[in-house]
């Protein structure tokens, strides 16, 4: 079993757990996990850790994400995406492109966002989606997230027997924990017509891009893993250790602080990745030790 990261281009209709189950079979190990859920409707980058790389996943989940989304204005749904039941329909033919641009600007920066009722957020110890599917009205608290970019890339009017709608294509760069479904819902609400997400593709998680991703069919034909050292060096600053520092780190001991505020990859003189470390109380503390694990 190779330790490392697999960048999967998740197909529509698959849950993130479905992908993990398939990678477990391909890798021949149950020591597999992912670094952040994609909804079944969504496609694109799902970062999967194999072996020792599963210990990276909690840190990779906190990295910046990039999405390409399509939002329909004029319809709201129970799930804030196309998978839910229609709640309300309002004419959107009066909405122009300038109003949409103003709406996306208002949702850019540090914002307080309420997650969708059908989401993995825990409410009193149970996932919100389980409560919602049981018929319970879920009260979710707003959470602070950062939307670095919410750019309109397409604007189309849609006239159908169901009404007059607007479809908006957008690119979103955001912090961990941001729900694109909530952005779609809130953009529609701010414009007074309601909105929901009709398509979503994640194109980047931290440093890992969709251009690097493999489909499940490609992985079945040739299962390739990004080696652990390469995966760490791509995602975090690298610190090269002396032999003495490396010995201390392998045993989980502190070393002198690094010049970085976040996690740093610690590498032995021979190029092996030994650990992730963070500065704590004036020294660099290993928080994940790979050597010997």
Swiss-Prot record:
Signal peptide: none annotated. Keywords: Isomerase, tRNA processing. GO terms for molecular function: RNA binding; tRNA pseudouridine(55) synthase activity. The active site is at residue 39. The keyword Ribonucleoprotein does not apply. Its EC number is 5.4.99.25. It catalyses: uridine(55) in tRNA = pseudouridine(55) in tRNA. InterPro entries: PsdUridine_synth_cat_dom_sf, PsdUridine_synth_N, PUA-like_sf, PUA_sf, tRNA_psdUridine_synth_fam2_C, tRNA_psdUridine_synth_TruB, TruB_C. GO terms for biological process: mRNA pseudouridine synthesis; tRNA pseudouridine synthesis. It is an enzyme of class 5 (isomerase). Belongs to the pseudouridine synthase TruB family. Type 1 subfamily. PANTHER family: PSEUDOURIDYLATE SYNTHASE TRUB1, TRNA-PSEUDOURIDINE SYNTHASE. HAMAP family: TruB_bact (MF_01080). Responsible for synthesis of pseudouridine from uracil-55 in the psi GC loop of transfer RNAs. This is tRNA pseudouridine synthase B. It comes from Thermobifida fusca (strain YX). The gene is truB.
